[in-house]
Every structure is written in structure tokens, then in C-alpha cells.
């Protein structure tokens, strides 16, 4: 069973620690969501786990050092979607999503019927069929975000890192994307680590929340144990009510006057 293990992870920028002493363990089939105020280090943590920015400490995949892997091998293990994905212009949506299969191809090989089948499946599940021949440059922000997520899911890596995957999406597409990720992590046994700003949504699908503040984990556990008025007041500076619902805690901002 694939497992991502992180021990004592630190990320420094200009000699200042922006992520400090992070310990984390996520197995396939599990979903951990990282929350926290702006500047807490959420995106930096995900970039470090993806190997995009330098870090110290251990990042292990099934006990093997991730930093020893080639870029191709790393892509077979980990898929990453940035908060604002950079996409090439002049490329069709289908061809971009198909790039997710590149890590699985042998040298000089072309995509197999299975690769094409996987790509068509993900495009269909994310309601992108009508855009299949569109140039990526012509898409809206929300459409581009769904296409980026589709490429990552087509990659079929056992670990997927999603930085604010639903920020540019309306509520209908938010639900569609999160439902598909939840379905695949259960059916295909994928380990998911995401960041989210919407506290209510963060408690709907993940098994575990990590609350980050000033680069440190200040709370972790179930949504019910982390999403408390006290935690939110202390680390977000916000006055809220939290209502228990069958789907998870509902966080409602309160007026101060």
C-alpha cells in the first residue's frame, strides 16, 4: 500500500522558515486537507511535497527518498495541480489532458488505446467534452482549472496534490470536481493532499484536516475537532458560528456589530 511519509519538513525563503517541522503521513485511499490563513505556508508545503521548491527533512514514498527519484519516476508517483496552472497556448484541451500519460510512456513510444481511453474517461467525468478541440487559451479561468485537474487525474499517480482545486469554480463544478476526486481516491486508491480556503467545503470530503498558521501545524484531526470557533478566531481572526450537519461542520461568519 503506497504511503507518503513526511518528517521534519522545512521550507526556507530568504533565510526565513515559511514551513517548519511538518510531520505527515497519508496512505492511498486517504484525503488530507491543509487549511490556514493567507501566508500560512499551505502552497509552499504542497510545492515542497511535489519537489518543485527546495526543502529539508524527509519526504518518503513507501520508505524511499522522493528526492532520489528522476522527474519521470516522480511523476509516476505524484501528480500536482497548481493554484494558477501555467498552460501552453496553441494546444487543444484533449492534447493537454493527454500529457498526463507522458510519465507512463516508454522512450519514443506513442500513447496506447488505453491512454486514450483514460483521457476520454476523465474528460467526460469532468464535463469537458464540449471543449475537447478548443485551444486552451480560449478557456475561462474555471474551465482551465478543470482541464488542469483532468490532466492530473489522467496521470493516474497514486498520490495527487491539489492546491486550491475549486477556487475558480462555481458551486456546481466545485461539487462535480470534488465528487470525482473522492470517487477515484476510493475506487483507484489514491492518496489526496489538498489545500482549501473554504472551511465548510474543506470538511466535506477529506478524512483529516491540518490547520497551518505561520508555517506550523497548530491543529490536526477530524473536521469536527479542527473547525471550531476557537481555532478559527485564534488563527484567522474571524468570528464564526459552526453548525453540525450530517455532511460535516458548516462555518458561518458572524457580523461584529
What residue ranges belong to the model's regions?
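Conserved ABC transporter NBD signature motif
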Residues: 57-65, 74
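Catalytic Walker B motif of ABC-type/P-loop ATPase nucleotide-binding domains
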Residues: 160-164
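Helix-to-loop junction immediately C-terminal to a conserved catalytic motif
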Residues: 50
